[in-house]
Regions:
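Pore-lining transmembrane helices
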Residues: 1-344
Length: 344
C-alpha cells in the first residue's frame, strides 16, 4: 500500500495538507476573492470621484466576477499543490466550485483535497482513464461538499463569531491574543489569510489580526535592514515575513521584536482607535497592501483612516521592532547575519 501511495505521490501528513495545501489555497484566494475585492473597491471609489463611466463599471463587473470564482481557484490551487495529474487538476475546478457553494472557503478546501487524492488513486489505472478520472474527482468532490462542507463551515463560522464576540467584550486581552496568533501564523508556514477568511473574522478582531500581521512583516523588514537592505525591506514589508522562518528556527530571539510590537499595538487598535477590517484583509498584514486597502473599504477613504494606517501598521511597528532588535543585538542575542534572507 505504501509503495502504491508513493507512486501516486499521495503523502498522508499534516504538513502536506495543513501547510502545503493551505498555503496554495491562500494563493487561490488571492487570485480570486482578494484581487476581485480590490478591483471592485477601486472601481466603486473611482465612480464616487468621477462618475459612472463605462470603464469603471466594467472594472466593478470584473471584480464581482473574479470574487465569484473563488471556489474554482481554490480547487485548482489545492490540486496543483498536491501534484495532481492533468485530468485531476482540471476536474478539481468543479470540486472547488461545489465546495465553495455548499461550504464556503473551508468546504472548497476540503472538497478539493479529498477529490484530488481520490482522483490521483484512479488516474492512469484503467483504459477508461479520460472518463473515470474526472468522474471520480468531481463525484467525490461534490459528495464531500454536500455532506462535510456545511458542517465545517458552520463550525469555523461559530469559532470566528466567538472570537469576534470575545474581542468586543474583552478588547485588551483578546486583541493581544488575536494579533499574536494571526501574526505568528503569517510568519509560520500557515496561511493566516486563509485562516482569517475561513473563520470570517471581521470588526475589531479583524483589525487586531491585521495589526499583528503587519507588525511581523514591517518589524522583520526594518530590524533586518542592515542584512537585507532595500530588497529585503520590500520582500518582507510588502511580501511575506515567512522568508524569515529558516532564520527563526536557527535563532528564535529574532521573533521577539515583531511579536512584542504586535502585542503593544493590538490594545491601541481595539481600545483607542477602534480599527476594523474584513475577512479578506484580516490575515494579510501589509502584504500587497491588501490589509490597508481593506481597512479603507471598512472605515472609509478618509485622511483620518490614512493616518491610522500609517501609524499603526507601518511607523509604530517599525520603531518598536527596531528598538528591541538593536537592544538584542547589543546584548549579543542577535548577531549580524541572523536575519539574512535568501533572495536568489
Amino acid at each position: 500500500m505504501k509503495s502504491f501511495l508513493a507512486k501516486k505521490e499521495i503523502k498522508l501528513s499534516w504538513n502536506n495538507y495543513l501547510i502545503n495545501a493551505m498555503s496554495h489555497m491562500a494563493l487561490g484566494l488571492f487570485a480570486s476573492l482578494i484581487i476581485g475585492l480590490i478591483i471592485k473597491t477601486m472601481a466603486e471609489q473611482l465612480q464616487n470621484l468621477f462618475g459612472e463611466y463605462t470603464l469603471f463599471l466594467f472594472l466593478e463587473e470584473l471584480g464581482v466576477l473574479t470574487m465569484g470564482l473563488m471556489g474554482p481557484a481554490i480547487g485548482v490551487a489545492v490540486a496543483f499543490s498536491l501534484k495532481a495529474p492533468k485530468l485531476v487538476l482540471f476536474a478539481a475546478v468543479v470540486s472547488g466550485a461545489a465546495g465553495a457553494t455548499l461550504g464556503g472557503p473551508a468546504g472548497s478546501f476540503i472538497a478539493a483535497v479529498i477529490s484530488t487524492e481520490l482522483g490521483k488513486l484512479i488516474s492512469g489505472e484503467t483504459k477508461l482513464d479520460i472518463i473515470l478520472t474526472p468522474f471520480v474527482t468531481v463525484l467525490s468532490g461534490f459528495v464531500t461538499a454536500s455532506f462535510v462542507g456545511p458542517w465545517i463551515q458552520t463550525g469555523l463560522q461559530s469559532i470566528g463569531s466567538l472570537i469576534i464576540w470575545a474581542t468586543e467584550q474583552q478588547p485588551l486581552l483578546m486583541g493581544i491574543l488575536v494579533a499574536t496568533i494571526m501574526g505568528l501564523a503569517l510568519t509560520a508556514p500557515i496561511s493566516s489569510a486563509a485562516l482569517a477568511i475561513m473563520l470570517e473574522l471581521e470588526g475589531l478582531a479583524a483589525g487586531a489580526a491585521t495589526v499583528g500581521c503587519a507588525a511581523q512583516m514591517v518589524g522583520f523588514a526594518v530590524s533586518s535592514y542592515r542584512e537585507n537592505r532595500w530588497s529585503g525591506l520590500i520582500s518582507l514589508g510588502i511580501g511575506t515575513s515567512m522568508l524569515q522562518m529558516p532564520n527563526i528556527i536557527k535563532n528564535p530571539y529574532i521573533l521577539i521584536p515583531p511579536t512584542v510590537a504586535g502585542i503593544i499595538l493590538a490594545p491601541i487598535s481595539t481600545l483607542l482607535v477602534g480599527l476594523i477590517n474584513n475577512p479578506a484583509g484580516a490575515g494579510m498584514g501589509t502584504s500587497g497592501f491588501v490589509g490597508p486597502i481593506m481597512i479603507f473599504t471598512e472605515m472609509g477613504f478618509t485622511l483620518e483612516t490614512l493616518i491610522i494606517i500609517i501609524l499603526l501598521l507601518i511607523v509604530a511597528p517599525a520603531i518598536i521592532s527596531l528598538i528591541l532588535s538593536e537592544w538584542l543585538r547589543k546584548i549579543g542575542k542577535i548577531q549580524f547575519g541572523d536575519m539574512k534572507i535568501n533572495q536568489s
